[in-house]
Amino acid sequence: MSLSLHLSGWPENSESRQRMLESSSSTNFVQHFVSREISNKERLLSLFRRLRNGLVLVLTPLFFGQMLNWEGPEWKCAYCVCIIAVYWMSEVMPLAVTAMLPVVLFPLVGVLDANTTAKEYMNDTNFLFIGGLIMAAAVEKCDLHERVALSVLRCVGSEPKWIMLGFMTVTALLSSFISNTATTAMMVPIGQSVVQQLISSFQHHPTNGERGRLGCKKMATGLVLSICFAANIGGTGTATGTPSNLVMLGQLSALFPKVDGSLNYVTWIFFAYPLMLLCLFVAWMTLVSFFLRDAPEKDEAVTEMLKTRYNELPRMTYAEKSVFVCFCILLSLWVFRNPGVVPGFGVFFKKGAYTDATSAMIVAFLLFVLPSERPDLATYIKKEDLKKRGCLMDWKTMQETFPWSVVLLLGGGFALAAGVKESGLSLLIGNSLSSIEHLPLWILQLLTMLIAMVITNICSNTVTASIFVPIVATLAQRAGHHPFTLMLPTTLASSFAFIFPVGTPPNAIVFGSGMVKVSDMAFVGGIISLELLVLTVLYMNSIAYLTLPLLEFPTWAIIANSTMQQ
């Protein structure tokens, strides 16, 4: 925040700001009047929000209530879906609380029984998510992610455009495996330090004029924007990178029970990582053209500062080494369970007995067992030393850092998908989309991605994927296209929330730094969104065919379709 105040000419020192405000009695009067007016506005806005929330909560079930009188279970399911979708998008209640409504609504209206609905909240995909988050929490606990970030950034040079590329690369890499929010929260302070160093060096050159000052301000904006954009893009790279990816995998199993293993952790990386890197490059080029045209020249002091920060890190601890080994073990288990090219170790188990969630939970269990300090038999004998020793992960850290609300949100999405399938609502939606099913595939991809991209900027990507993935799966099925051809781009588009600060937590963190205006984020974010939309459609109709079997309509989708039609 102090950096933005400095750039705008506002005194950084609180005493200086106070003297400026108290320079005259009229200033005090105006300040008091304005603060009173602002407080009145805040009270009115708060009252309006409470009234609006109450009206939405009460009127939404009444507005859609006529659906309950229509014949067929699909309309009862549609009634529940409409209520949940409105509550999610308006956020009249916490998202996780709304996600629990299927447990109440589905049994009451006769869509699913309570036991079947509740099972969806702790299915295999949700345990995969839980295991991945425990691994990420262990990485954050020992600060391994900071060491990785600084070790890469100190090698990128001192020119602003390469610094930006370094930040985006590190952020995308980390957000592929740990929380996008945690990655952004760690990278923004580092980015602010780098920008402060560049501006400090710029001020030592008195020949730089107003244009150079504005260039510094734009550079600061562009650099922190690149962090949140890279975090959103990086989450698409792996199946566990962001919750919306897991929503798609979970709903794939719910909508198509006989689906094969063609889309797993390994094949997702082969499919999505090249696209993620292409999207990252396009976003970087766009940010450079908008924010770094008048940036200061390269400054070796920045490189030295990053090297100094890296050298100030303590030696790699036993905990960091152990967590890194556990991380490698987890990746190896995910990769070699079913690599696709050759049979994996999964062939030694019955079908469904060992999944990616099994690997995640095995490593999560190890993190709670392995010590955080090097074992020493002599000290273990002493009881007082034994009490001081901890493990790589502990339950207190879990309670403080684990996003339980996201687990419920995922479960709510899976319950919705199960209800949509069992009630026949997916078939009803497919029939209603018959007018556009004959359009070329690339146009369908553009339309579905555009809708998902608009919605994800006003509500979470998990909610967006939960609502739209079943719809586009049915549309692809009716149009005779492989379901992946619409499900995958729609899922990816749900992560392309670059326009508003409320779109994703990384956006909100960057906006909270005080270095970004809403207009800056909205303008360049809108352009990048359209660029990535076109790039994804081109990728889906070219390179994607080399990574996934998308050319032929799968037998598991034909069987599901024929069953539904009967």
Curated annotation (Swiss-Prot):
Keyword Secreted: no
UniProt KW keywords: Ion transport, Membrane, Sodium, Sodium transport, Symport, Transmembrane, Transmembrane helix, Transport
Location(s), subcellular: Membrane
Tissue specificity remark: Nad-1 and nad-2 are coexpressed in the intestinal tract from early larvae to adults, expression is from the pharynx through to the anus. Expression level is significantly greater in the anterior half of the intestine than in the posterior half.
One biological process term in Gene Ontology: determination of adult lifespan
Main location: membrane
Family annotation (InterPro entries): Na/sul_symport_CS, SLC13A/DASS
One GO location term (cellular component): plasma membrane
Similarity comment: family membership: Belongs to the SLC13A/DASS transporter (TC 2.A.47) family. NADC subfamily.
Name of the protein: Sodium-dependent high-affinity dicarboxylate transporter 3
Annotated organism of origin: Caenorhabditis elegans
Phylogenetic placement of the source organism: Eukaryota, Metazoa, Ecdysozoa, Nematoda, Chromadorea
